[in-house]
């Protein structure tokens, strides 16, 4: 037998032996949190976002939560408590038609509007809107609110969830809108649209173009020249409302001005519920059953009296 052959055989046997999970393994197995199993919550990031210094009492740490669906943008100011997360204020992109923006409710420009609306609404609720007006006109440059003499600026931390934080992501559009609205949020300009990784500087003109929907207008012009049929189908809602690439910036400026003027949430007028026809018998109360029985007895007695008169 060759030297070392037995050791080689034993090594190969060890390699191919399947690891058996014992009864103790399954008995002591602990499942992860439900939202971690579903892939909805990054608890490692959440722990760092909500943990407060132990020498601060009854001082919640607020988070700017930005989430995106296929047709909506959700932005909320939230703080954690033992009983669950508490929402201080919220803004949605489906509210933007009230301010003059009826199309493109999920792009970067709409995300900026939602962040701006949330910031102004939160500060108005806390009666800080006059003291912290924020950046009234968006220029694309980085903006950080300066503390006033009386009250410190409202501070929140950006909660992006599980989204991939690439440069120019819409979640940073919400961040930029909230910053211009007057909320103090620790941030860097490296992820704003228009940041050049080669020069390591933010180009304000490119960022401004995204805030005012310039990237959408450029795509509209490209389709109008190259693929008119696709333009008719892709931008049908824009065409229906007579929105052209040249008047895109003016439209967004009006939306920003309307948000600054009145950021309060508007209650939707809902029609009263219709009264449906009832097919089953209504359940009577005790008093109604008693009155019905008395009426039947009176009817029977009157019928008997009528028969006796005939006889």
Task: Please state what every model-predicted region is.
Residues 2-7, 11-311:
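Ribosome-associated RNA-binding proteins
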